[in-house]
Regions:
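Catalytic domains of carbohydrate-active enzymes, especially glycoside hydrolases
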Residues: 78-92
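N-terminal basic/disordered segments at the start of proteins
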Residues: 3-26
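Active-site beta-loop-alpha junctions enriched in small/polar residues
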Residues: 24-26, 96-97, 122-126, 165-168, ...
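Glycine-rich anion/phosphate-binding loops
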Residues: 70-75, 95-105, 134-147
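Active-site gating loops and adjacent loop-to-helix segments of metal-dependent hydrolytic enzymes
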Residues: 27-71, 121-139
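Active-site core of metal-dependent hydrolases
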Residues: 191-249
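Active-site gating/metal-coordination segments in enzymes
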Residues: 90, 108-111, 116-195, 238-240, ...
């Protein structure tokens, strides 16, 4: 395969142009947060995002609901048109089930922005997993991803072009359900030769764990026979000053 599936169909790699490999277009993170009980914090949580609360948001991104949901389609189209006007060609949209993936909206955004948009398959951190993920086996989850990559997503003919960002949280390096998803994603990569990305646990860094947890993910990839030339680790900027770690990876 010398190209990639986009929300509007297959394109040759020569048509990609400048590409963002990790972006979110229509994102709903309600499954990951809870409204605070403290009255003052609740006021900030429910407020429209504005300059009066920006310092609070900088200290805690999830303190304001308006800050973590990207559901204003007109704004998304406007910003992607700006990206295209400055030379952008393609965006990999890593929205997933459980965090708002909406194939029809992404398709409309692609039409209106005239960008190539690659859509994803997989699941994010455990807290966001749809209930069925808990009950399905590794092979069953792999088959869902393979179907979305080869045949189409949710009964459409729109095919995923990337696996991920399959994400990890806690306990470090992964919740058991997240490991199941990653193992299934590895099997889907081997079966389809698709690109694959993992969101590493960022909790570990905050709690003082070494950033080398990502090496655990690479060990799993090797065990499952993943083509590492098709893999990229998301959020590597979190450890950008640890040169030795990046060299090892």
């Amino acid at each position: 395969m010398s190209g990639v599936e986009t929300v509007l169909g297959y394109i040759d790699k020569s048509e990609l142009g400048f590409t963002h490999s990790h972006e979110h277009i229509y994102l709903d993170l309600d499954s990951l947060i809870q409204a605070p009980k403290d009255p003052e914090k609740l006021k900030i949580y429910n407020a429209p995002f504005n300059m009066e609360i920006i310092s609070d948001v900088k200290n805690q991104l999830s303190i304001n609901k308006d800050n973590i949901d990207f559901v204003e389609v007109d704004t998304v189209i406007k910003e992607l048109r700006e990206f295209k006007s400055r030379g952008g060609g393609t965006v990999a949209c890593l929205d997933l089930p459980g965090i708002g993936r909406n194939i029809e909206i992404i398709k409309e955004v692609a039409i209106q922005s005239q960008l190539n948009i690659i859509v994803a398959t997989g699941w994010y951190i455990q807290k966001s997993h749809p209930e069925y993920v808990k009950h399905k086996s590794v092979d069953e989850l792999a088959e869902i991803m393979i179907t979305e990559l080869k045949d189409g997503i949710e009964g459409t003919n729109i095919k995923a072009g990337v696996i991920g960002e399959c994400a990890c949280s806690e306990p470090v390096p992964w919740h058991p359900e997240e490991k199941k998803v990653l193992t299934a994603a590895c099997k889907a990569q081997v079966a389809t030769d698709s690109a694959f990305t993992i969101h590493p646990s960022l909790v570990g860094k905050e709690l003082g764990h070494p950033p080398s947890i990502a090496e655990t993910y690479v060990d799993l990839l090797e065990k499952e026979g993943v083509d590492k030339n098709k893999f990229y680790l998301s959020h590597s900027d979190q450890t950008c000053f640890d040169k030795d770690y990046h060299v090892r990876l």
